[in-house]
């Protein structure tokens, strides 16, 4: 009988919750620091890996922002993005929607265009050479002011041919969705696809407020929605996608272990859940690792796994025609395997 990891390895899928800065592996971090003649955040790979032990979201963010300082040139952002897309293609990811945090770079004097041009060149090459499609989502850092976010939104409008979505990330506590109500209203007026992190370290109320005030197309994380049955029913009724990141949730102690994760319960409630790797260089695994860890710990069936993959395409920004092409490929792949597990 086909093993779950083997089935997942060949499974056509999309990734919708991936921070490009979170793919900065320690070896690349050290290489870029040397290339840019900067002191490295850590002296060696081993020290960096030991530092990747987090107690909560903020302990991760402290290291995350420190590490991004090695990203300076257009070439750096190109190398970082292409490395992820090559990894993604090797894991049968046919489409990726990639977050980037320009405020983490512009505050250091790096031009917005430097970040975007490097990323876009890598996306074009990956599409041509590997066949993987991409969309870019500019994230606003929620620990900064809405006015600072508006400055970034104005930049995004200028680069709308490359940026298709607006997101909201960084520390959820003390930075409610209402803080960015005006920004999201303007982003919606400009025609951007809207998503936001909610219900990771925040409560179910944060998810509800994100839906009601920001009018997002998708919720990133959202696992705390399960604490509010009425909210769950509303999410199911509206078919709002939730981009869940299991290894991230365990690494940041949202759940004590993978066995305690509520992913399977979310599926059983009929929520449109997708699986994602979030910041794989820091959380111990890329997308296939997340699928495998969740499947084995939660005893997911083959039909559960196929449903998660189908959700990833249905929840994406792809056109209806593009979604159908991917879903047909997924159906053809699944047809060759037994439905049971």
Swiss-Prot record:
Matching HAMAP family: Adenine_deaminase
Superkingdom as given in the UniProt entry: Bacteria
PANTHER family linked: ADENINE DEAMINASE (PTHR43114:SF6)
Catalytic residues (positions): 200 (proton donor)
Cofactors that this protein relies on: Zn(2+)
GO biological process: adenine catabolic process; hypoxanthine salvage; nucleotide metabolic process
E.C. number: 3.5.4.2
Annotated positions for site Important for catalytic activity: 221
Annotated positions binding Zn(2+): 17, 19, 197, 278
One Gene Ontology cellular component: cytosol
Cofactor binding note from Swiss-Prot or TrEMBL: Binds 1 zinc ion per subunit.
Name of the protein in its database record: Adenine deaminase
